Design a protein with these regions (language model features):
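Active-site hotspot residues in diverse enzymes, especially metal/ion-binding acidic/histidine motifs
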Residues: 1-388
Length: 388
């Protein structure tokens, strides 16, 4: 009979692994075993450590390290809210998502160096001292949109607006990724209260990740344009501001100014507001404005408050009614197919370049599987759709 193999895990390592993991996922039996290991009453088996590693969502190898490490991604220190506070620990869902995006960025960086060799001129091309107006002009020029781009072809619909701006941004070489779960694990949804988006700056392959659980679509659209401003400013960010976009630092103020100028230009807003008859009810006025701009009802009300077109009391009423208005105007669509969902997660140019590299032997299937989290026939079918 094979003997059960037990291993020594120092208490300092055990305590550290548990402190950075998803402890509330542990079963009562696992908690009792951990208490016994801490007291030295018995030692864990390899199988038990594997089980706890899975529940904590922490790499199995961490149990065998000589001393604790800090695996907090550097971008966590660049979060919008709380960056000046004690760091704490990000969730394992966020850590694993950033790790996957970093791996994709590393691959894309090397691919660009090998095939084109040039840096992207927009990365870090502006500073906050340049002001938001110049950054807005630069982004419009790069994305080939004019000041009133949202008036065309139903682009007041935030879903259509997001699709257009994402495609245009990808065309400039910026990687745009989005997901609502960790990889393909539907049991690990991303928390929008922890982060809405993040940007990883690199001169060859800047990457923007959008948290797809951040609702409604107008929130993701705002995050996308906000993060584009970070690319022009060459500044990493973990965007976790869930409050009204007033900004907390000059950097954030500039990025918010850029986003609002592109999505809701001041002059156009005022002209539209004044074109609506004075006796129009608030509900009807908001619905009319929503037909013109790809922003939330709250953003529209906030702009009206800024120009003293409504009172603070009316703004509060608008804010409270925003959820109802959003539900009434939401674009009801059927559920996307599996492959459409997978394609939407990845930057389109990244998938095209990856498919080409695999076909030429520059990237192994194993590495491609690791980058995408997709294997076998599913990967092959996805690549065919990506290049079709």
């Amino acid at each position: 009979m094979a003997q059960t193999v037990r291993v020594n895990v120092p208490r300092t390592i055990l305590d550290w692994v548990i402190s950075i993991g998803t402890e509330d996922h542990l079963s009562e039996n696992q908690r009792q075993n951990i208490d016994a290991w801490r007291q030295g009453a018995k030692r864990p088996t390899v199988s038990q450590l594997h089980g706890i590693s899975d529940k904590l969502q922490v790499p199995f190898g961490y149990f065998f390290m000589d001393e604790p490490i800090d695996d907090t991604p550097p971008v966590y220190a660049k979060r919008t809210i709380g960056s000046q506070q004690p760091q704490g620990h990000p969730s394992r869902d966020l850590v694993d998502t950033i790790d996957q995006m970093t791996a994709i960025q590393d691959w894309a960086r090397q691919d660009r160096i090998d095939n084109e060799g040039t840096r992207l001129e927009q990365v870090g091309s502006r500073t906050i001292n340049d002001g938001s107006d110049l950054i807005v002009k630069d982004i419009r020029r790069a994305l080939k949109i004019d000041e009133h781009w949202y008036r065309k072809s139903g682009l007041h619909d935030p879903a259509k607006a997001f699709k257009l701006l994402r495609e245009r941004a990808e065309g400039t070489g910026i990687l745009i990724m989005q997901n609502g779960v960790v990889g393909n694990n539907t049991h690990r949804p991303l928390d929008p209260t922890e982060f809405r988006a993040f940007t990883l700056i690199d001169p060859y392959a800047p990457l923007i990740f959008i948290n797809k659980t951040d609702e409604p679509e107008t929130a993701r659209l705002f995050s996308l344009v906000h993060e584009l401003a970070h690319v022009w400013l060459g500044a990493d960010e973990l965007y976790n501001d869930t409050a009204l976009p007033t900004g907390v630092t000059r950097l954030e103020q500039v990025c918010n100014e850029v986003a609002t100028a592109i999505l809701l230009p001041d002059e156009d807003f005022l002209e539209t507001w004044q074109s609506i008859p004075n006796d129009t009810t608030l509900d009807e006025r908001m619905k009319e404005l929503k037909k013109r701009f790809p922003v939330s009802h709250t953003a529209l009300a906030l702009r009206a408050l800024k120009h003293k077109l409504i009172s603070q009391e009316t703004f509060q009423k608008c804010n409270q009614a925003a959820q109802t208005w959003s539900e009434e105007t939401e674009n009801k669509q059927g559920s996307p197919t599996f492959y459409n969902t997978e394609l939407s997660r990845f930057d389109s140019r990244f998938l095209e370049r990856l498919a080409s590299s695999v076909a030429k032997g520059g990237t192994t299937y194993l590495d491609a599987y690791r980058l995408t989290g997709i294997t076998g026939d599913t990967f092959t079918k996805l690549m065919k759709r990506a290049v079709s």
